[in-house]
């Protein structure tokens, strides 16, 4: 229902006016219903990011214009209709009427309307009403027990981490065909690509990990993106980078999967390393001139580097200060819009630090630094000097502050044995690490133990980034 000057204005939109899957690929046909080739059943689903809600109802599609929504849908009686709130269903012959409760305020791109003869799964153990939907032909492949378990774990972790209970009343995850994105964080009605996350065969652990990560990524958006939304598309990178970082953190700290950071390093971080060394590299933070340009820089810098830099920021300020800053940011701007500076200011305030300089070097400058350990050993076989050397690297070629862990290893019958770790704040070209002076000479030095830093690390002590 759209209100003009306070008066409700009803509107109807035949499905042929709707975008199918991703609105950039508009479905030109008499109808935009998805026909399942297995059983010829028909389904529809919306996807309005960044500015396509106006195809369904009159509105201004900008993230800083929030509204509440009240929806009524008439549909075939055997259909499920899903939107952002719970509905009351009443019968009317072959048609049923679905009246959805008025929603909280959120941006139009987060509105969802999905319908069809879906199979429905309900989690009877959940504190928050949770449902899964799939096409009938794929219902046999829905691992509801596992998906619901990850969902419950996510709610428990995020509720405690953010200090804000989940506010939307229900949580639906709808697996649909022909979806051109991996998933979409519509408020309380997450749409997920079925062929990417419903497995016909016994899945490898890596695929289970990926599905759990996607579930937790979209759930993180319920707080960071849906409750608090970017003021303009300039900060879409932060929306996605934060959800990416949080999904891996939630896996490690909120589920039995304690190896998710390794997956992050091999996938997201390596994607960032590759893209950041191309001639086309760009700063994490870029200006979006208009809505049509929203996804122009949607790449490994947006997701991979952005998430890697947030991981570095959490280590730089301390994990608890980071958590408190995030919680403060969400509580202060709940149901409103905010900008990246609001976020980094909240983190800085919680940590007692001014992050303006850090922000300029990490978010507004492109490229990747190089780091290498350089040290001397005396006649007694002990370290007499230890430094970390930083090179400017490519892109904008600037030196950046880093906080990392240096680890010393010794050969133990052909296997590396960890002897000592120290935390180091790297500044400038040379950073002395006096805590390692006097230690027995290592067989191997790893300057990024724990993978907290984002840089190229050279493991050969004969290489000097200062002369590169």
Located regions from the model:
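Solenoid-like repeat scaffolds
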Residues: 334, 465-467
């Amino acid at each position: 229902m759209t209100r003009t000057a306070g008066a409700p204005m009803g509107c109807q939109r035949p499905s042929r006016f709707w975008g199918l899957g991703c609105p950039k690929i508009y479905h030109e046909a008499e109808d935009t219903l998805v026909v399942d080739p297995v059983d010829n059943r028909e389904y529809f689903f919306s996807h309005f990011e960044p500015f396509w809600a106006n195809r369904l109802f009159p509105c201004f599609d900008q993230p800083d214009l929030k509204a509440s929504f009240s929806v009524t849908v008439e549909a075939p009686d055997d259909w499920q209709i899903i939107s952002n709130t719970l509905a009351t269903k009443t019968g009317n012959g072959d048609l049923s009427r679905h009246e959805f409760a008025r929603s909280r305020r959120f941006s139009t791109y987060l509105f969802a309307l999905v319908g069809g003869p879906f199979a429905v799964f309900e989690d009877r153990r959940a504190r928050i009403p949770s449902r899964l939907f799939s096409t009938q032909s794929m219902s046999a492949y829905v691992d509801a027990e596992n998906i619901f378990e990850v969902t419950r774990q996510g709610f428990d972790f995020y509720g405690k981490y953010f200090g804000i209970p989940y506010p939307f009343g229900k949580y639906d995850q709808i697996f649909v065909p022909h979806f051109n994105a991996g998933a979409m964080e519509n408020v309380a009605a997450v749409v997920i690509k079925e062929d990417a996350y419903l497995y016909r065969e016994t899945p490898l652990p890596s695929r289970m990990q990926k599905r759990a990560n996607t579930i937790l990524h979209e759930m993180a958006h319920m707080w960071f993106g849906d409750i608090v939304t970017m003021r303009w598309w300039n900060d879409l990178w932060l929306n996605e980078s934060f959800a990416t970082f949080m999904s891996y953190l939630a896996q490690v700290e909120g589920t039995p999967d304690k190896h998710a950071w390794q997956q992050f390093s091999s996938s997201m971080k390596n994607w960032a390393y590759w893209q950041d060394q191309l001639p086309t590299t760009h700063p994490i933070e870029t200006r979006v001139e208009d809505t049509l340009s929203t996804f122009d820089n949607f790449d490994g810098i947006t997701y991979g580097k952005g998430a890697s830099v947030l991981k570095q920021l959490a280590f730089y300020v301390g994990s608890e200060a980071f958590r408190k800053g995030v919680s403060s940011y969400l509580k202060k701007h709940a149901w409103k819009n905010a900008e990246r500076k609001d976020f980094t200011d909240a983190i800085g305030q919680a940590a007692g630090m001014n992050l303006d300089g850090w922000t300029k070097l990490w978010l507004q400058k492109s490229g990747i630094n190089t780091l290498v350990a350089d040290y001397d050993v005396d006649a007694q076989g002990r370290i007499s000097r230890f430094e970390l050397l930083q090179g400017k690297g490519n892109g904008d070629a600037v030196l950046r502050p880093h906080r990392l862990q240096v680890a010393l290893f010794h050969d133990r019958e052909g296997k590396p044995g960890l002897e000592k770790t120290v935390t180091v704040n790297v500044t400038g070209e040379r950073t002395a690490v006096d805590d390692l002076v006097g230690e027995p000479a290592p067989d191997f030095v790893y300057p990024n133990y724990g993978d907290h830093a984002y840089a190229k690390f050279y493991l050969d002590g004969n290489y000097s980034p200062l002369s590169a």
